[in-house]
Amino acid sequence: MNVLVIGNGGREHALAWKLSQSPRVGKVFVAPGNAGTALEPNLTNVPITDIDVLVAFAQREQIQLTVVGPEAPLSKGVVDAFRKAGLKIFGPTKAAAQLESSKDFAKAFMKRHGIPTADYETFSDAAKAHAYIDAKGAPIVIKADGLAAGKGVVVAMSLQEAHDAVDSMLSDNKLGDAGARVVIEEFLTGEEASFIVMVDGKNVLALASSQDHKRLKDHDEGPNTGGMGAYSPAPVVTPEIHAKAMREVIMPTVQGMARDGIIYTGFLYAGLMISPEGQLKTLEFNCRMGDPETQPIMLRLKSDLVNLVEHAVEGSLDKVEAEWDRRVALGIVMAAANYPDTPRTGDVITGATPEVEDGHVFHAGTKLNADGQPMTSGGRVLCVTAFGETFKAAQKRAYELLAGVNFDGEQHRTDIGWRAITRK
């Protein structure tokens, strides 16, 4: 069968790579893909992003299964368009994707269905937002309502920082429409984890747990980013926490959406804050897999992903289980100069062959130049991912592999995995 993956990031490289390992797959197309997917022997890039053109391509190439990676096409209704054309596609509809595309929608949904989350208020008037901040004090969290590529959240440790964030979003319109409304919520403490599942409308299949590293610099300092590295499994997600997350967050979300008349199918990612006492609060929902969490998760997945996705599309996820490599997988993001502000592009990359021993180099912001060499084309450039028997071993191997990859201005964290390694 022919399969299509929509997107061009590290997550899509990992999904396409895993789908192509299925014995049932003939061709895997990636639209538009990147240099990494271009270099993979079993993947073919197609330079299409327009939804109608994607539908026509899927019909022409007899694509029997499509998997959507990023949030933007989901929020634009790519799933609705494919379904209308009678094509099988895995992902939430435009209505269901509001769980990610509108923070206010998600918060109101959680409040309505009793899903644990931080207290909040939504504002489109800057003066009212400033008054609320003064009343609440710092630390406090300011979030753009709309999609902002992981950069719409400011964890303000001071009142000044909070007021500046509101001005930047509401008054200066720095994030455009995404920041026309802001959600201001209480600051939560604890440890974060990424809880990602597959949903078929009613049944849920949990994927391996993972943990992301959001801040740009070591020791979790610097600005928030789309994610600078991740590992799987996440020791903070104990069997008790796993059961609690399914019971208190995931199942009420799937059932709540259905009660609201919106059937949810697709990947669902709950960003959880886990308190030292083991209480859960939902920080955010994403209607897709995380990036870079997908990379270590796909490295560990032993099951046929095509089979899992087909069951999800058919509404029979209760008939399958996922099998995981018991080893740890850890991925380190290599980012471009000036990321996350205005990343520099066009730098030639050496040593980034995807296939490596004990791991894989997943490409994100890369494309091939006129000479067929990979070069930087975005903020997060690569995710160097490796296996290890322990967190320490996976970390050591990933950094060994990373040492062989180079491009000008490259930046990465040197402490990915520190929480798991220092955990008592």
Language-model-derived ranges and their functions:
Residues 5, 30-31, 67-68, 89-92, ...:
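General beta-strand structural signal in soluble alpha/beta enzymes
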Residues 20-23, 37-39, 60, 90, ...:
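Solvent-exposed alpha-helices and their adjacent loops that cap or buttress functional pockets
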Residues 1-94:
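ATP-binding N-terminal substructure of ATP-dependent carboxylate-amine bond-forming enzymes
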Residues 156-294:
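Internal nucleotide-binding/catalytic subdomain
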Residues 246-268, 286-358, 369:
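Active-site "cap" helix and flanking loop/linker of ATP-utilizing ligase/carboxylase catalytic domains
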Residues 4-5, 99-181, 211, 235-251:
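Active-site nucleotide/adenylate-binding loops and adjacent lid/helix of ATP-dependent enzymes
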